[in-house]
């Protein structure tokens, strides 16, 4: 084949084509006039080599490559023992991790995903993947990035609340991890010359959400430009099967290699609150209608220092009694703290949350109820799927089978499941998460994306000082989550950077595209599975439509 490969051997390819034309003419398949006319034409190629930087699901493909080629985790790769132990457990128990090293061919050598002709069947739905990428592109291009650009133009400040030492540290690390630095160092260029090159203007391409742009900048200014680009990540999966349907780790894999869907972890803010409320229902015997006083809460911590969370903005704490569901819908910090005070043991709450699917380390302190811990979109979506899967946690799965080049099955994969909570608790939490959408901080999904009459639950989240914006969404057949933020936590939107403002619209856009495509199998008529015997909770306040609440942009900072 190489001998007549058009790109490598154009003369041989031309001779071979004309030979075929001669034989077709001799057989009467074409006339001699047609043969002569075609033979006079050159062979034109529309050749474009396949690049790992382009095409659909670039972040997913890279995650798959890294996963299948992964070595057993080492302690030095993790900040704490807990995360290291969880990574080792996942590596040992999940066969897709390190598959190429764990399995060998007949000759005893490991599999090579590049050379062995493997056919890897993934769970990604090409339609949903496209819709997720389109939703992120639309919101980032039209709303979020212009907001950041306007802020930078107004303030002339990129790294918010960062002193000179911190700004220098950020830039120093960015330079030393850049491809330019690596290539020059590899070529033997000395450090002084390398660093000087970052201040010399040169022609280059830079990323914008409107497309690549040719310009002349210093490499240092190029780094600053790309630091200003806001990032977003989204994951969606089928809660019943654990199949990952869409996976977007960032805006453009060529320019931003770091995967914020699974690789990067950020503070999860109020997206942890549904799990704290689940503990209250499952372990403390409370219900959505349990009355709780709207008052400040103080808890004495293990070291004897009292802790009392603050509320964001001008929130009135007037002592009125409201049902527990009211606190979740409005994401009140004092209601989450009240649950922690009843629980008494933060470690018990942390263990419970781990069992529901958040395997990242959770510091067992009262403040865990406000989302001070870190996780990623992939993990959060899988944990939220427990609510839609009748209380059963299903590990995410993104490969179903692997075949060799002859089509022989050599590996198949199935999700692992564990009972996390009862189906009654799961359904109760679904009704409370619906309250977040229909009468709480997630109201924008209803009135802006026409989902007032859809069975959909969700939770907004915003970490301190708008560093991280989150939105998690639960449907009967799909769970989706989105994170928005800067590459560095010092890069953030000072105002209007809350989860309900910048993360929720991405999910809303994604869902509307799915609903508009019947072939996805997702419909606005889908219903959550209700247990055969289920108490009816009729909390008067949660049934009222509170327009001011649903249009409220929460500012869920914690201190």
Task: Describe the role of every protein-language-model region.
Residues 1-183, 339, 354-355, 359, ...:
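Non-catalytic, structured segments within soluble enzyme domains
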């Amino acid at each position: 084949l190489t001998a007549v490969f058009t790109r490598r051997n154009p003369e041989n390819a031309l001779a071979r084509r004309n030979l075929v034309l001669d034989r077709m003419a001799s057989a009467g398949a074409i006339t001699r006039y047609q043969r002569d006319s075609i033979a006079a034409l050159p062979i034109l190629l529309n050749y474009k080599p396949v690049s790992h930087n382009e095409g659909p699901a670039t972040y997913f493909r890279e995650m798959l490559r890294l996963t299948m080629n992964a070595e057993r985790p080492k302690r030095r790769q993790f900040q704490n023992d807990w995360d290291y132990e969880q990574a080792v457990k996942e590596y040992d128990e999940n066969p897709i991790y390190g598959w190429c090293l764990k399995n060998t061919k007949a000759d005893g050598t490991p599999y090579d995903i590049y050379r062995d002709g493997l056919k890897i069947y993934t769970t990604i739905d090409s339609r949903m993947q496209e819709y997720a990428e389109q939703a992120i592109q639309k919101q980032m291009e039209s709303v979020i990035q212009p907001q950041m650009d306007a802020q930078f133009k107004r303030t002339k400040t990129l790294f918010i609340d960062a002193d000179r030492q911190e700004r220098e540290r950020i830039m120093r690390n960015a330079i030393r991890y850049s491809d330019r630095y690596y290539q020059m160092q590899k070529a033997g260029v000395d450090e002084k010359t390398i660093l000087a090159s970052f201040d010399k203007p040169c022609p280059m391409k830079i990323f914008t959400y409107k497309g690549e742009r040719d310009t002349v900048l210093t490499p240092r200014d190029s780094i600053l430009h790309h630091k200003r680009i806001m990032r977003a990540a989204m994951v969606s999966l089928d809660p019943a099967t654990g199949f990952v349907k869409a996976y977007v780790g960032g805006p453009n894999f060529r320019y931003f290699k770091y995967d914020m869907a699974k690789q990067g972890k950020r503070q999860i803010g109020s997206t942890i609150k549904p799990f704290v409320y689940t503990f209250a229902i499952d372990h403390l015997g409370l219900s959505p209608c349990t009355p709780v006083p709207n008052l400040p809460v103080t808890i004495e911590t293990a070291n004897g220092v009292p802790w009392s969370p603050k509320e964001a903005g001008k929130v009135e704490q007037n002592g009125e009694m409201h049902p527990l569901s009211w606190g979740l819908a409005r994401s009140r910090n004092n209601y989450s703290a009240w649950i922690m005070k009843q629980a008494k043991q933060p470690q018990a709450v942390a263990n419970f949350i781990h069992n529901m699917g958040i395997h990242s380390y959770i510091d067992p302190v009262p403040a865990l109820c406000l989302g001070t811990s870190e996780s990623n979109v992939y993990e959060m979506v899988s944990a939220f799927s427990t609510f839609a899967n009748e209380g059963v946690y299903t590990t995410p799965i993104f490969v179903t089978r692997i075949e060799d080049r002859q089509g022989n099955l050599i590996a198949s994969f199935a999700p692992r499941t564990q009972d996390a909570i009862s189906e009654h608790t799961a359904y109760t939490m679904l009704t409370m998460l619906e309250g977040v959408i229909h009468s709480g901080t997630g109201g924008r999904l209803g009135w802006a994306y026409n989902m007032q009459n859809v069975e959909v639950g969700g939770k907004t989240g915003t970490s301190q000082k708008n560093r991280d914006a989150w939105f998690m969404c639960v449907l009967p057949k799909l769970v989706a989550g989105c994170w928005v933020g800067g590459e560095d936590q010092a890069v953030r939107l000072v105002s209007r950077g809350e989860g309900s403002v910048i993360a929720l619209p991405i999910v809303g856009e994604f869902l509307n595209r799915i609903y508009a495509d019947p072939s996805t199998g997702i419909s606005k008529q889908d219903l959550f599975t209700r247990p055969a015997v289920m108490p009816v909770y009729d909390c008067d306040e949660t049934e009222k439509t509170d327009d001011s609440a649903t249009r409220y942009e929460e500012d869920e900072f914690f201190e």
